[in-house]
Amino acid sequence: MKKLLLAVLTIAFTFGATLAQGEGASEETRMTLRAELLRMINRDRAKFGLTPVQLDGQASAIADAYCQAQIRNRTTGHFTTDGAAPYMRYSFAGGNDGVSENAAAWSANYGFSDRALYDMMRRSEAAMMSEVAPHDGHRRTILDPAATHAGIGLAWERGEFRLTEEFIRRYVEWSRPLPRGVATSQPILCSGRAARGYDVEGITVHHEALPLPMAAVTANAIETYKLPESKREYLPRLKGRFTQRIAGGIEEVHEEYSDGSRGDFQVAPDGKFAFAIPLPDGPGIYTVVVWVRPHGSSGDAIPASNVSIRLERSAGALISGTR
């Protein structure tokens, strides 16, 4: 029953255009464009029988800040000069859910009229949806059947336009969220509950080195991202031995996973779980992914969190993670 749990990756678009040297973004225009892009996203999802995503205010604010940082640092894609991956950026800003990112960038040379902004946004969404496998990361992100919310970031200034879509998978209600920074490698207690109708399938903890600052040219050369391969997998505790009635008598059942283990953490019938997350691999970024699955389903498990925890090389402050 041990399973390989795969993470989502996405790709970034960069466009050149004979568009815009113009004014900075106004909040009214941004809100109008955001609502229109959400309509486009849900239109595209509806064509494939998928439920609409709801606009998420927190994720939109995170995406806006990232778009502004991209223009400030002259970067495109998923990384800016701090070296943080998208899931780190979302988590360190307070996000507790699963997240996958699409990004588009335009460089321009005339004024940003409302019509020009709308056209860049429309063409970005259309280009993403026109992708063909296997190079269809944006399209698959938009059409993720597990996405429940979306954050939409927009920024334009000095002839640059940036658009970021953060697709959120919200299936865990955290009663004890994980911190975002710790000073020691002691296990960290967390607890929560899976959304009604979903079961907790497992927890993976991915480890990677602390991000390092990078030049804009280096950040712009990175076209994709994914969680690191280095990970540890933890599974719900099984019942152990129990009896069940069968034709002609009673049999004893002994539950175990394929490696002979009985699991690592308790999950209650109502979906509540608690686990002390180990941090055994030294300093770095530990990203905690809680996997859930619709009750009774044999389909793919859903990565319902991307919570990144920073363990410094030396003692540091503890930062609470909230939503």
Predicted region positions:
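Short, well-ordered surface patches within globular domains
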Residues: 23-95, 136-151, 159-160
